Amino acid sequence: MGNNLRRAAHRRLGLALVCLGVWRCAAEPAPRTGARDAALSYLLSRLSPFQSEGIYYELGEDRIRLSASPEGARFIPSFELPDDAPLYPVLTEYKRVFVYDAAVEVCALVLAGKHSEAKQLLRTIEAMQLLDGGLGFSFNASGDTFYNHSYLRSGTVAWAGYAAVLYGHETGETDFRAFAGRIAEWLERQQVPGDRLLDPRAGLIMGGHGQWAEDYSELTKGKRTWAGTEHAIDAYFFLRDYARSQQAPSMRSRYAAAADRVKRALLEQMWTEPAPGLGRFVQGVDRQSLNLGKALDCCGGWGALFLLAVGEREKAAATLAYTAETFATTFRPAEADEGVSVTGYRPYAGHNEGIDWDRYPDVVWSEGSLGVALSYLRLGRRDKFESIVDNMLKLCTVPGDPRSGVRYSRYRQDLAAGPKAPVDTATVIKDLTQAPSACCTAWLLLVLESAEEGNFGKFWGPDQ
């Protein structure tokens, strides 16, 4: 999320795209165990060997050298688009992988007990780690060596570290201890020092590095000094659990203190209550002022999960109430052959990301909707959890069947009316694709596995 919608670039097209997660829904609700197995089948069927000499380009003649891919490294392509789609050369032809997607896939596979496959994905993520400990946003995994290594987002880096820590906790292995340690040091350097009376960002995590031009034709390098709520939440869970994994008392206290600073900054600086019984986190802050944008991941998704984890149950209920009032929506197809109606949540409200989202009230964003579902489950509202899950199953390419992949989003302004239908790019909202997404399918699996008794609280669980 974060710059919520994930950006990608390609040397020939200079385009970018968003990727985020999703989960399940069914025209007629399928047995949830069957949906879980089907989502797992989708991911496992797309695992491919990752083979790279470790030399990558980004723009022009620049090159960086990283580690060659280790034995056993594998990847899952983030998107499946037909070869006549405008974004096919960017997302599908060279098997584009978004690092965030891969991290979500690792978490889902770990909870599903597929530790060997999770390790194979982590091997690939580890091979892409930069010398300073960070991770670029996305890379081509087959037939081309593009790596968006100057565009980093702290939330993505934190997710990769969290996936490694979760894997280590569940397996007892230490293979990725050094990898996670370098991420911890990188995030520590992004944490804003000082007192919030002097700097409203104090304690939060700066956004990362790099910024693409609006048309993705130019990349401005350098640190992004704004701090976003979503990145802070991602970093909190990683820093907290990384601290728990440390045996040395000095390391435990060092990173526990960093996590605590993030937690206090979020609760004291970013929380607002616009009306009685309603609450939310603002979207971010720079040196001068708060960004009051309305983003789903700062409210009923990531925000509510964070509040529940830190024991702020009343605030979690308030932000879910705000989410229902502000982001709930329904996609209704214009034609019968465009699928079925789906109720879920839109990514933004009001003006955000250069768009008036209130002009597009029917956008259903699957990843964010899944986060809301998991929040309701942990609040004890299994009825709401099941209702959202059943709706998300309708977002499968074949409604109700996760083996066909879960769409990234759904709305009337279709990216494509069908698998081989003509595409009118003018109808695409921002960078939201309606193609099936590996990350979205992984989110479905992650949420369903999190509902299992043996897994409850393993992912982004409560403070202890």
Regions found by a protein language model. Give the residues of each.
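Bacterial N-terminal signal peptides that target proteins for export
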Residues: 2-13
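Non-membrane alpha-helical segments in proteins
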Residues: 100-112, 120-124, 159-163
